[in-house]
Structures are given as C-alpha cells and as structure tokens.
Amino acid sequence: MKKLILFYLPDCNVSKLFEERLHKALALPEFAGRFNLIRYNLYTDTGRQEAKSIGVNDAPTAYCNGSVLRGVQSDYSIRKYLRSILEQS
C-alpha cells in the first residue's frame, strides 16, 4: 500500500473540493485498498513541518513517492495521477 499525503487548509473551499474528488477516485475499484491516505492540515506545526520536508508550500496538494499534484484538478486528472503512481512500482 502506498502512502498518499494530502496537504490541505481546513477553511478553504478549494481544499474541500480537491479532497472530495480525491476520495471519489480512491473509492474506485482500480484504486481501492492501494493507497493509505494521510491528511496534514497546513495550519498545524506538524503539517507545516511535513510539507517543508518534501518541498510543498501550498494547498491543496497531494504527494506520493516524489510525485506532486497541486491545485484544483478534474476527476480525470486525479485518476491519471493515481495511475502514474501505481505504474512507478
């Protein structure tokens, strides 16, 4: 199972939309059970430290194995991103 990190801002509609689309994609049979989603709030010290350690400075952002997906994305773009991560291994 791959560790997929989501960096978000809790009061941001863009972050909420991004997270909803990500959850929708992760529920598809193609991806179900293949990712462990970890959420970091960028308003917390832990979230900021984790983001800094991998070079992320904005939200919403998804990160897995060096691959980064930033900003509002379509459902298609999120699925494409997840497929590319799975193909890396």
Regions found by a protein language model. Name each.
Residues 63-89:
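Non-catalytic, surface beta->alpha helical segment in thiol-disulfide oxidoreductase systems
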Residues 7-9, 31-47:
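Thiol-based oxidoreductase modules, predominantly thioredoxin-like and allied folds used
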Residues 52-64:
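Structural micro-motif
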Residues 13-14, 45-46, 76:
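Short alpha-helical
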